[in-house]
Design a protein with these regions (language model features):
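Acidic, Ala/Val/Gly-enriched low-complexity intrinsically disordered segments
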Residues: 2-4, 13
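Bulky hydrophobic/aromatic "packing anchor" residues in well-ordered structure
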Residues: 27, 103, 345-346
Length: 382
């Protein structure tokens, strides 16, 4: 069905084709808001550049083809940088159904065996890395959907190396702990997402992620072999240990009883925590190490996904037609897709039709049929 080959990126009707992929990626690099991003805009770009530098020729050929990258290593890095931030800016569902995919709330007193229980229904970062990388490796993908799958893998591997994306002290991964510091951050999680990475960049260069990436590659070059891909659960556990030791314990934050599904926002410290110069210097070093590991491991994962170069039959051509969107006026008789989780429905060209996770979709023949089952139209569907 033609609709399955379409991937909507924006809140309008932006339909990705090979002809406009580069424009989409360029706009993502220039206009993306920093505050919304895990690891921050620059953190994800650093991971992507390191990974691009360490891909095998076989893996690089597939990545370049899927992302429509410009020629050369620099073009590949630019495309991966831009793709790395899309899951935070353009692939969000209207009802935020994908929000839980970016982290796993492991309690500070959890054991390694508790990981499965912290990922209900496979809706967490570890499960999604496994799911999307497997789909890419299976090879039975439509090239248009592969763009989204690859962007998610690039992004999620970065996320899982941010320590507070794999830890919670009944505080939503540090989101409930205000900070007292010279850096611009409202809470501990935000401090680790962006300002700490920016400090790291300015300590190396004038705030350029590409330069920072190359510096980190050299600094941790001896660890590159050791940082081959390991199961996502193992990485989550490793990041959790970093959070325990270098964030919570270092700041003398008490350990709260395990409450991973808590709706309330608790500050276990009972006060704003001070991030002084000594702590920030230590945090810069830890963040740099985590970003380097993420980049090396992302490259290792993609090298495992694609061990053979892309074949000519798999190479997209500029003449490949892009499917035309179905007009909203035809929605009453077109395909209606509902989100089981949010009970919202949409149709091609409106709402979150092409952003709904495949395993979360239900198809209805008409709008009336959807509404009879208790579904409501997405806000921007007329």
């Amino acid at each position: 069905m033609a609709a399955e080959r379409r991937f909507w990126l924006s809140r309008g009707d932006l339909n990705i084709t090979r002809q406009n992929l580069l424009l989409v990626l360029s706009v993502a690099l220039l206009l993306c808001p920093v505050s919304a991003l895990a690891w921050g805009l620059d953190g994800h770009k650093i991971v992507a550049v390191i990974a691009a530098d360490n891909l095998t020729p076989a893996a690089a050929s597939h990545v370049a083809s899927i992302l429509g990258a410009p020629p050369g290593k620099r073009g590949l890095a630019m495309a991966m940088e831009a793709a790395s931030i899309l899951p935070d800016t353009e692939f969000r569902d209207e009802d935020h159904a994908t929000a839980a995919w970016h982290f796993i709330d492991l309690c500070l007193q959890d054991r390694r065996a508790d990981l499965a229980a912290r990922c209900p229904g496979g809706n967490c970062v570890t499960a999604k890395i496994d799911e999307y990388s497997k789909r890419l490796k299976d090879g039975n993908y439509d090239r248009w959907r592969a763009f989204g799958d690859l962007a998610f893998v690039i992004h999620f591997v970065g996320d899982i190396h941010q320590p507070l994306h794999a830890a919670s002290d009944a505080d939503r991964g540090g989101n409930c702990i205000p900070v007292d510091s010279t850096i611009r951050a409202k809470n501990l999680h935000e401090a680790w997402d962006t300002p700490i990475v920016r400090r790291l960049e300015y300590s190396i260069d004038s705030g350029r992620p590409e330069t920072t990436a190359h510096k980190l590659e050299k600094t941790y070059a001896s660890e590159q072999t050791a940082d081959s891909w390991i199961p996502a659960d193992d990485i989550a556990w490793e990041s959790n240990q970093v959070a325990r030791t270098d964030i919570y314990a270092a700041l003398h934050i008490p350990v709260e009883p395990c409450q991973p599904a808590l709706d309330a926002c608790i500050n276990p410290a009972g006060r704003p925590v001070e991030l002084d110069a000594a702590y920030l210097d230590q945090a810069d070093a830890i963040a740099g190490h985590q970003l380097a590991k993420a980049g090396f491991r992302l490259a290792s994962l993609l090298n495992e996904v694609w061990t053979q170069p892309i074949s000519p039959s798999d190479t997209p051509h500029a003449s490949d037609p892009a499917p035309a969107p179905i007009a909203a006026s035809n929605a009453a008789t077109g395909e209606i897709v509902g989100n089981r989780r949010s009970k919202i429905y949409a149709w091609p060209g409106c709402g979150t039709y092409d952003k709904m996770a495949p395993d979360n979709r239900v198809v209805f023949p008409t709008r009336e049929a959807a509404e009879q089952q208790g579904y409501r139209a997405a806000r921007n569907c007329p």
